[in-house]
Amino acid sequence: MHDHITNTGGKCPVMHGALTTSSMATNMEWWPKALNLDILHQHDHKTNPMGANFNYQDAVKTLDVDALKRDLHALMTDSQDWWPADWGHYGGLMIRMTWHAAGTYRIADGRGGAGTGNQRFAPINSWPDNTNLDKARRLLWPLKKKYGNKLSWADLIAYAGTIAYESMGLKTFGFAFGREDIWHPEKDIYWGSEKEWLAPSDNPHSRYSGERDLENPLAAVMMGLIYVNPEGVDGNPDPLKTAHDIRITFSRMAMNDEETVALTAGGHTVGKCHGNGDATLLGPEPEAADLDDQGLGWLNKTQRGIGRNTVTSGIEGAWTTYPTQWDNGYFRLLLNYDWELKKSPAGAWQWEPINIKEEDKPVDVEDPSIRLSPIMTDADMAMKMDPDYRQISERFYQDPAYFAETFARAWFKLTHRDMGPKSRYIGPDVPQEDLLWQDPIPAGKTDYDPQAVKDKIAASGLSVSEMVCTAWDSARTFRGSDKRGGANGARIRLAPQKDWAGNEPARLAKVLPVLEAIATESGASVADVIVLAGNVGIEQAAQAAGVEITVPFAPGRGDATAEMTDVEGFAVLEPLHDGYRNWLQKDYVVSPEELMLDRTQLMGLTAPEMTVLVGGMRVLGTNYGGTKHGVLTDREGALTNDFFVNLTDMKYTWKPAGKNLYEIGDRHTGEVKWTATRVDLVFGCNSILRAYAEVYAQDDSNEKFIQDFVAAWTKVMNADRFDLA
């Protein structure tokens, strides 16, 4: 029965036909400029072991939070031989784990943060800055195992650091559960272009340009770091230069100077750095470790490598006299002593105090009869040397209660920044106070007649384009990364959104007063009326194409006020491009189609949804400024599949006519029929997108096109309706 098997040259006849590792060239390596549509198809049921019916938000509501809290408190002082706790307390380790999970967040695109449990996966689990955090997660495994599906890794990682602070005496601000785990690394997050860990700023693939301009949206200063280099810029100590890096990095995490000092000091009030050994003896990081290391990395298999002999950052020592308790010792030592540069046993730069009193020295992690010098990193010295940071540090030193409260609030912000609105918070310790950075929205109304509102809108004289564009612009700000933006709140009528160039303020000045008047008359929120107007426009466009439809609608959006809106905080949501409306504010290094892909991923759309939405928006005449690029139809304003029919028709040719401009002409006469942009033509050029375009161009697909367009449109309008989930 095996006679048909031929000689395979010693290779397995089955396995070597599959791309089972990354050692073989992929399509992206063969064609590196191809669109990476995989970023639109992540975290679905094929990778999620929980099944389609599992709802984490429901499951975590059944969690016994008090029992978990008791277990975490007990864990902090239950030292394990395989990874002993410093001074018998794991608090510093757990806090660093939580810090480094939450600290990947960046405000520019909302990506990163503690909300997904991504610290379990590459590349984050193997970054140099996360050395030995694999041990922290293994220490937590018994609790994750015990509480099972009621407790996500993401919530546990965030909660462990919070309880660690509580166990050491800090009154925390609160905590919310509700972070749902992902099951594979994110494919969409850009961490930088460097090809080596900790590449210096003069690296050929550096994230820096000019004097020291950090590439957007990055916040970390080096590949593999969470924040700044603790030894100094490119490893060269200079507290004032480090202060510059700190200010940029923390501002890109949505933190001001006071929050920055509080977080730096509060993070270093407890725990220690580890560099008492030879860093070259550490084994590879988890992703490169041997099979029998079972996911653990940085193992020292030639020396003891644990306890007082642990090597992590290479810096060695504690910041404070009592590293297992919350106090004001950080500022007391930093401000009252002079400090000098020294090298750690591992060869890292660190600052040590001159002529320190014996009683101010922390004790050894294993032997309390031994006292050792405390240390400061270059980042700590920046809190003393930078004038603005120094002023804040002095205030915190003089007012420990104010420092503790400021830190507790900043820690809460750090660990919850990517969770979205407060309505997503779950658990008994959710703070009652509404915070401006949470983008609060009042409760909406449902006690009105949506059909009566639609009738008023239809009679208002607004055009299909005006209604659809206004609804789209209101909703397109949504970011699935940190759950910000969206149509709920109707902030398109407030600063800064009403003045954004991409929202065409002149059009808004005409349309919004009409819709606001209808909202007042009907008792509906303006947010609901804006969405209803878009729905009316689509229904009218479908009717013009000979199809009667009703676009689904769910009332209940609220209207935010100016007092509820952080103008500066919302500035990062401003669209500088929108492929769906065929608009670029200016020319960018990144191609228009890549920008559209990035926006699509943030909005939570799939590649087929992106395709059908672009095709529909074009024929509805929703281009920015009324341009006709990509409007491949003679029936503008009617919801037809003409965009796809004409894009795939071989009777036309496509020729460049300028930067990001093409002419579509008759193949035989040469007569120019339409113009288009790269964003239009990519749906005929990219093999995957063309496959979707061909589906919608088929003779039997107009009804499917309309159904799919309406479904995708409704998804965008409801993206921030967490109450509907």
Curated annotation (Swiss-Prot):
Belongs to the peroxidase family. Peroxidase/catalase subfamily. HAMAP family: Catal_peroxid. The record marks R96 as: Transition state stabilizer. This is Catalase-peroxidase. The keyword Heme applies. Keywords: Heme, Hydrogen peroxide, Iron, Metal-binding, Oxidoreductase, Peroxidase. One of its GO terms (molecular function) is metal ion binding. The lineage of its organism: Bacteria, Bacillati, Cyanobacteriota, Cyanophyceae, Oscillatoriophycideae. It catalyses: H2O2 + AH2 = A + 2 H2O; 2 H2O2 = O2 + 2 H2O. Heme b binds at H268. Binds 1 heme b (iron(II)-protoporphyrin IX) group per dimer. One of its GO terms (biological process) is hydrogen peroxide catabolic process.
